[in-house]
Amino acid sequence: MWLPYLIGQPSRMRPLNTTEGLGDRLRLIAFAERQAFHAFNEAIIRFPNSPKGLLEAWHWVALEEAKHESWLLNRLAAIGQKIEDRPVSLNLYYSLQNCQTPKDFALYISDAEERGRIGAEKFAEVLKTQDPETAEIFKQIALEEKAHIALVDKYF
């Protein structure tokens, strides 16, 4: 489920203006997308009595998370960095597993998605001259996260 990621205590991020530092961030965010993918799919099973339409929406978001992860991992490879070079944490996934109701899950993951959206917007801005290709990926992810976040208001 988590391979080829190296699970463990994350190392300190290296400077963003280095290839390694950019790789650290791409890896971290790609892994957050992987955790969200699995959490959404598991929520579909855990909360079968969710509001009508929500399970289908979660399935759609899970596929979106996988798409974002693939973009980030492709970029990670393009800059010569490996997924398994640095450890990543399962804290997000474990936190989502602690949610006891569909609403708790939706609120918690929406908050995580909002933090991710803000981070992606900041990376897009910071990287637009240093690395326009990565900046564009983050810009698109931030844009798409808005639709994921809006699900909370739609269903709760």
Annotated model-derived regions:
Residues M1-F156:
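Non-heme di-metal
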